[in-house]
Amino acid sequence: DAQKVLLDLAERMAIPVVATEGNKGLIPDDHSLAMGVASIHGPQHAIYTLQNADVILALGCDFGEFTTGGFGNKVVPKDAKIIQVDIDPTALGKVYPVASGITGNTDTVIADLLEVLKERKVDRQPYHLSPWVKEVSRKKEEWENSVAPLRASGKVPIQRFRLFHDLRQALP
């Protein structure tokens, strides 16, 4: 399934995962490679991850207005090296230029990529030891610490961080 192959790829290659609003939850939010949702209003560590990535592997992402903060370069950097995978060939490079565009079902493309990695004996690395993962994880932790007081706030009207925190606690 999509979650399993994405997580396998991310862990095997030590790739921090920034989701789009429509794909949030493909890997658990508490996974050390989960960097939140790409959006101008998203967590700063998600934007930092995209702004500083060597390569952006965009899986089924159409780079919509919400995700990109208005199609500019506030979320996706101007000089980004993007590999875009989409089932719709007209989506490839439509918003941002791509270094490589791959037409196909993202689950199938990821599964094929994993097979190639296995054939080439690219072993699973301890992703938590990757300097890049350590860097973005530190940014994530800093952000989590900065919003912790907002999650506990008793202010009226309710703070959005408190609202979402309480909803997460209440829902199964």
Q: What is each of the regions a protein language model found here?
A:
Residues A2-D8, G69-G72, D166:
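A short acidic, amphipathic alpha-helical/loop segment
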Residues A2-G22:
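Redox- and metal-dependent alpha/beta enzyme cores, enriched for Fe-S-associated oxidoreductases
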Residues K4-D8, V98, V109-A111, E115, ...:
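Conserved catalytic alpha/beta core of Sir2/sirtuin-type deacylases, generalized to analogous enzyme cores
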Residues L6, E135-P172:
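Active-site diphosphate/adenylate-binding microenvironment
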Residues E11-I15, V55, E115-D123, R138-N145, ...:
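Generic secondary-structure signature for well-ordered alpha-helical cores
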Residues A19, A38-G42, P157-Q159:
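A general structural motif
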Residues N23-E135:
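Glycine-rich, acidic loop regions that bind phosphate or pyrophosphate groups
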